[in-house]
Amino acid sequence: MRWSLCFAILVGMSQSVTIVGAGLAGSEAALQLADRGVRVRLVEMRPKTPTPVHVTGCCAELVCSNSLKSEKPDSAAGMLKRELAELGSQLYAQAKLHAVPAGGALAVDRTAFAEAVTALVEAHPLID
C-alpha cells in the first residue's frame, strides 16, 4: 500500500521522471516506475566516465560479490530482502536467479547479475 500511494502521488505530479545513477536503487526505481506507466530517463555516467572499482558499463554493477549480505530472516538484511520480495523487487529476483554459494549470504555472479539488470532496463519501452 505504501508504494502504491507514493507512485500515485508521483504519477499525478509528472508523466516522466529523470533518475540519476543506474546503480541498485536507480535501476530498481526506474523499473518500478516504468512498470507503473511512468516514462523514465535513466542517466548513468559509465561507461563514458569509468571508476576505479567498476569493470563494465552495466547497470547495478556490484563491486563485491557478497554485497547483498545475509539472507537470515532474523537479520536486518534478511528482513529487508523479505520486504523486497513482497514488494516485487526486480533486482532481488535477478539476484536470486544469479546467486552463487555463500553460506547464509546472498552473493551473486556480479557480471551475470549486472548484465541481467541491464537487459531488463534496456528492454523496457518506457525507460530511455
Per-region residue spans from a language model:
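N-terminal FAD cofactor-binding segment of flavoenzymes
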Residues: Q32-V38, L42-Y92
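N-terminal Rossmann-like FAD-binding beta1-loop-alpha1 element of flavoenzymes
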Residues: V17-V40
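Short helix-loop-beta connector
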Residues: M13-S14
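General structural feature for long, well-ordered alpha-helical segments within catalytic domains
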Residues: A25, A29, L80, F113-V117
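Feature captures the FAD/FMN-dependent oxidoreductase FAD-binding
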Residues: A85-D128
